[in-house]
Amino acid sequence: MVRDRPFQVVSTMPDIKRKWSFTWLPPAIRILFKGMPGVWRHRHQLVFCWLIVMQIVTSGARTLSGLSQSAPGFITEWRFRRLLSAGYWSLKVLLHWFAEEAIKSLPVPENQVLYVIADGSKKDKRGPKNPAAQKGRLNEHHAWFFGIKFVVLMVAWDDYRIPVDFQMVLPKGHPDYKKENELFRHMLSHFQPPDWAKVVMVVGDAAFAAKDNMKLIQARDKADSQRCWGFVFAIARTWNMADGKSLRNLVKHTPHSCYRKTWIPRLPDHKGRKTFWIFEKLTLLKHLGDVTVVLTKKGRNVGPQNTKLLVTNLLELTGRQVIDIYQRRWAIEILFKELKSGLGLGEHQVTKKLPRIEKSLGIALIAYLFLLRARKDDIKPGKPWSIFQLKTNFTMDLIQKQFQHSMALEINKWKKAA
């Protein structure tokens, strides 16, 4: 007796579960890598180009294994890993080149004012073998974390925000440990503003309001005859004036009648305006000289504890202009969110050596700069924009061109077969 065999259906449709991947880079994308510094050996330049593109288009886990899923067959995880492990090429050379190209490709502001903003952030990690990972917290009101700390220097004008440099903050026990302010001065001293910038305003919170930082800005202002350098920092109340009185006494004993009401427009992604009560005073601070100190609070009857102190070395600025400049510091907080959520900063599983970790962090910044150049036409003047929207537009355009390229190859194959 012959046992009946189960009925089988042979499908003539292609297997839609088969992994789909990109196979080529369109000319519009390849031309953006043209002129890149020649630091490469072997085929690492091609692998680097695909790493940047995959860092943008990948929406899932941006580990090296995840980035290689949609890449061509010859672009594998171990090629990405060997690229990051290679010690002959310098990440900072490439980062500075991509930053310069991004600045050149964007329109020049009418007022020719460039804002240089610095701030620190962290990326959580779990691997204890990472030499850059450390335990800490931002302040006593925040929870403890374990991860990598870093400082980013960015430039901004109009609605644009462009990272130009970054430094990792090593654990305190490391022999090469440097404080955040030392890293900030290193980045600022090597930063060269574009030729169109006539005024350079350095903006930072109270963590970067160190006297050495301000002296460096004043020194660059004296040495640079082509432009004016200034700063607007939030400042601690422990600073003393030349007469020996502290700023704490100024905040505590200034009556409400001395404050005046003012307002500033909100950032482009918000409607309306912000209202503040301010008091400005020309004074002489120790180690700095003549400055303008601005006391600002959100309500007339707000107490001294909720009053913020701002300081600037440009005496011609009004209190309203000072708080409007300091408001631009929020752009770097948006940048951190876009780098971590949109471009997967620090998600590469790279450990053991610091240069590899530095390169894995810098790849996200280079991808950010590359995406700005590729989709600069999507940023409308005076309107808010997001790296998430630019990323979506870039991915959809790349998929469309990949489909057209694949169809053209199939049609040519059919023509040759006919």
Task: Please give the residue ranges for each predicted region.
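Gly/serine-rich nucleotide phosphate-binding loop at the start of the catalytic core
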Residues: V2-L91
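Electropositive, glycine- and tryptophan-enriched low-complexity nucleic-acid-binding patches
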Residues: W78-R82, G87, L138-V199, V291-K308
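Short, conserved catalytic/metal-binding motifs centered on acidic residues
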Residues: L67-S68, Q112-R126, L153, V200-A209, ...
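Short amphipathic alpha-helical "interface-anchor" segments enriched in bulky aromatics
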Residues: K122, G319-V350
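Active-site-proximal, Lys/Arg-enriched surface segment
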Residues: V53-M54, L83-Y160, L170, F276
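An internal, acidic/charged active-site-proximal segment
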Residues: M168-K298, K383-I387, F394
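A short acidic-Thr-Gly-centered motif at the start of a beta-strand
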Residues: L95-L114, L188-W196, D212-K215, L315
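Basic, amphipathic alpha-helical segments enriched in Lys/Arg and hydrophobic/aromatic residues
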Residues: L345-K401
